[in-house]
């Protein structure tokens, strides 16, 4: 769907419905567009996780890791919240960790067990997505009611055992991708199906848009992502999203580096999924307006993404038609040139944009950061500076923030 290529707001934090309203209003006030609102796991009851020493359930998960009952202290009226997102023309996704099955304290326990035919009342129902009857009951009684209220898609976040406990050799991640995608396909035949989940191995490109997991917020991570994203096209896995700004901090990191965050946003413009995110850590800040010296540069990056919307959507269509990723290594277009194999940090974004990331801070004296670029044959226009470059050579360029 077109909205997937817009700006996604996400952060693992205990936000209330009113705080989400404030967030969206603030984005509007500084002229930053948004299409997707991700509500991480605190949408549901997480009382077990908030204890000092959280207990574990019979599946080895911390109580509250899996959940399907809205946390009413934060969302007193889920229906009103979802109605508000619809009125704001926002698409909303909820985070799911389904490993602990259906617990007796969940609001959905009675309708699920009745539909499934579970006779051990008062006992949890194990996660068994590879059983048709279980899956049918799960989608019908657990997820469908929330979808009818206004949940647009699911952020599946499977992190537990790799293989099914019931079907030897079956990858849980791959099978979740398959079942959730086809559920979306059947639920709304008139809409393009879409899920957001983890890499499930070769062949998994058929189903999810994927996220690259819990990366550290550091320059080295940003430097690696262009190579990682582009070369994934070699296995037909072109739809990667990253936690822009980095997911988590090293122990010694004191606070968010606004320059790193800005450069990550600038790189993110030229990736398939454009999502800021982080873990629940008070040292990490994702509100752009907390960095007044960088805010307007950050805003320009997000607005550039929207300026490129027709181009991005066309690149996505080409990916659908040909299998060639939106981000692809330089050697796809220039296989005969040795240089194309020696610049893993740069890539083509669609057919006409050569992109890379600035992966070091600006010099304290000059205010510039260096970036070596190999230009293939032709004439190249630098959209950051307005300069023109003749192709067939490598240039060291210098950029302000």
Predicted regions and their residues:
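Catalytic-domain carbohydrate-binding cleft regions of carbohydrate-active enzymes
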Residues: 1-401
């Amino acid at each position: 769907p077109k909205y997937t290529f817009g700006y996604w707001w996400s952060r693992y934090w205990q936000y209330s419905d009113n705080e989400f309203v404030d967030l969206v209003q603030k984005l509007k006030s500084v002229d930053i567009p948004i299409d997707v609102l991700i509500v991480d796991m605190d949408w549901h009851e997480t009382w077990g996780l908030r204890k000092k020493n959280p207990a574990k359930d019979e599946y080895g998960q911390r109580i509250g890791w899996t959940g399907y009952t809205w946390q009413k202290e934060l969302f007193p009226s889920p229906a009103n919240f979802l109605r508000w997102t619809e009125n704001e023309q926002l698409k909303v996704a909820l985070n799911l960790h389904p490993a602990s099955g259906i617990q007796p304290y969940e609001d959905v326990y009675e309708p699920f067990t009745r539909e499934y035919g579970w006779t051990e009342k008062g006992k949890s129902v194990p996660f068994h997505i590879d059983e048709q009857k279980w899956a049918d009951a799960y989608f019908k009684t657990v997820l469908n009611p929330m979808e009818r209220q206004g949940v647009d898609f699911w952020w599946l976040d499977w992190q537990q055992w790799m293989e099914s406990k019931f079907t030897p050799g079956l990858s849980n991640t791959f099978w979740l991708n398959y079942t959730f995608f086809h559920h979306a396909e059947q639920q709304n035949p008139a809409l393009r199906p879409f899920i957001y989940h983890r890499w499930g191995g070769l062949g998994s490109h058929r189903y999810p848009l994927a996220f690259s997991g819990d990366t550290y917020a550091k320059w080295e991570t940003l430097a690696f992502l262009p190579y990682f994203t582009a070369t994934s096209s070699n296995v037909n896995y072109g739809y990667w999203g990253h936690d822009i700004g980095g997911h988590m901090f090293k122990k010694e990191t004191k606070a968010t580096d606004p320059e790193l965050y800005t450069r990550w946003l600038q790189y993110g413009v030229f990736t398939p999924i454009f999502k800021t995110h982080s873990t629940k850590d008070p040292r990490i800040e994702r509100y752009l307006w907390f960095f007044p010296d960088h805010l307007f540069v950050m805003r320009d990056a997000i607005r550039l993404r929207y300026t490129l919307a027709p181009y991005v959507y066309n690149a996505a269509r080409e990916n659908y038609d040909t299998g060639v990723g939106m981000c692809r290594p330089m050697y796809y277009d220039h296989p005969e040139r040795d240089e194309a194999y020696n610049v893993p940090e740069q890539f083509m974004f669609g057919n006409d944009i050569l992109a890379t990331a600035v992966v070091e801070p600006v010099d304290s004296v000059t205010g510039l950061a260096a970036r070596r670029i190999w230009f293939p044959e032709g004439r190249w226009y630098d959209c950051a500076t307005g300069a023109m470059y003749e192709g067939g050579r490598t240039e060291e360029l210098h950029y302000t923030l």
